[in-house]
Amino acid sequence: MASSLVAWTQTRPTSGDDGDDRRGARRWWLLWSCLIAIAVLIGSLVSGNTLRHQQSFSILDEGAHYDYVLDLSHGHIPRSGDHLSQETMRAISCLGAYNQPSHGCRITTRNPADFAAGGYSYEAVDQPPLGYLPYLLTARPNDAPRQALLAARWGGFIWSVIAAAALIWAGWLAALSLLELCAVLSISLLSPVAVNVSATVTNDSSAVAAGAFVLVTYLVARRRDRPLLVIGLLVGVLTGLMKGLFVVAPFTLLVGVVLADVAARRKPTKATFVSRYGCVLAMTVGAIVGYGAWIVLVDARAVVSTSVVLHALQGFSTTGHVRPTTILNGVESELSGLIAWVPAPLYWIWNLAVYGSLAGMVVLQGPVGRPQLRAMAIAIFVGILALAVAFPVLNFAEGHYDFAVPTRYALPLLPIIGYVLARSLRGRGLLVIGAILPALAVFDQVYTNQF
C-alpha cells in the first residue's frame, strides 16, 4: 500500500506511453490537483477564520484599505488628499482599530481630524486599484459596520482561489508531480502571513496570485521557447497595478536566468538575447512602467500633495540616513514568511526547513545544487535583499522615515520558492516540507486556538 501511495504522489500530467494513456494521466492529474488545491484552501480558510471574524480593524492599515474599497464601490478612485468617508470613519469608530479603541456606533458626523493621519485616506497616495477588485464582489457598505467589514474581508479569499488556480496551471506547465504541486500550494497559500492578508481587507492579498501569474508566464515562454514580449509586458503592467513592490517577482526570475547563464558560462548573442531574457525582462520593465505611470497619475490627480499626506502620518521614527540595521531587520523579516505572529513552534520549524533548504541549494554541489535551480535559489535571496534595501530607501526619500520592509511584501516570492524546492527536493524531504509540516502546523494552530 505504501508503494502505491508513493506512486500516486508521483503522478505527472505527462505520464503514459501513448496518446490515450497520456490523456488519461492528464485528466487524473488535473482531478487530483484540484482536490489537493481545495484541501489547501480549506486549510487556509480554517486557519484564517478567527482573523476574518475579529471585530476590530487589523494592524495592517485595514481601515485605510477598507476606505479605498468603499470609494471604488461608489465608482470613485481615491485621490491623494481625499479624507476617509463617513462610512469608514463610522466603522472605525464603532469597531475600533489597532491602538484605537471603539468610541461607539452612533450615527453622527465624524471629524477626520480625530482619526489617524488627519483622517486622510492615505492608501490613495501610492496604491493602484487592481489589487482591490475582488473586494468589490464581497463589499456590502450598506450593512451594519461589523457585517460590512466581515463581508468585505472575503475578497481576500477570492485572491487565494485565483492564486490556487494559477499554481495548478504552473504545475501543469512544469509537469510537476502531485506531491510537488502540493508543496507549491502549501508553501504559497498556508503561510501564516498569506493566510493573514487573505483574511483582511488589503491589496497585499493579491501578492501570491501576482507571483503565481508571473511564474506561469515565465513557464509558458520557456515551454514554447518564445520571448512572449507583449504578453510579458502586459503581465508586468498588471503586476505593477496591483502593487509596485510586486516587481520583486519578475525581477527575481530575471536574476535567476542571468545567474544560470553565468554559471553555465553561456554568453547570449544578439540573436539569442531576446529569447533568453525577453519575457522576464518585459515583465520586470512592465511592472516598473505600470507602477510608475500610476504614480504620475496620482500626482496629477492629487488635491493635496502626497508629501503632506505622508507627513500627516504622525508618530513614525525618522532618520538622517538609511541605517544598515533597518536593512538587516528587513532581511530577517523577509526570511520569516512561514512564521506565525503567535507562539507556534511547528511554523518556526517549517520556516527553517524551507529557507534552510534554499540555503543548502546555494552552498551545496551535486543534484540538489544543479546550476539552474541553484541560480534561482540565489536569485530568491537577491530578491529578498533587494526588497530589504529598496523599501527603506524609498521611505527615506519620501520623508526620512525609518521603516524596515514588512514580511508580507515578500509574498510574491512564495510561488517561486515553492517551485524551486519542488523541483529540487525528492522523496521524504519534499513530503515533510510540502505536506506533513504545513498540515501539522495548521492542525496544531486550530487545536490550540492560537491565531
Located regions from the model:
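Membrane-lumen/periplasm interface segments of multi-pass, membrane-embedded glycan/lipid transferases
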Residues: 273, 277, 292-367
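Start-transfer (signal-anchor) and selected internal transmembrane alpha helices
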Residues: 1-48, 57-60, 275-284, 429-434
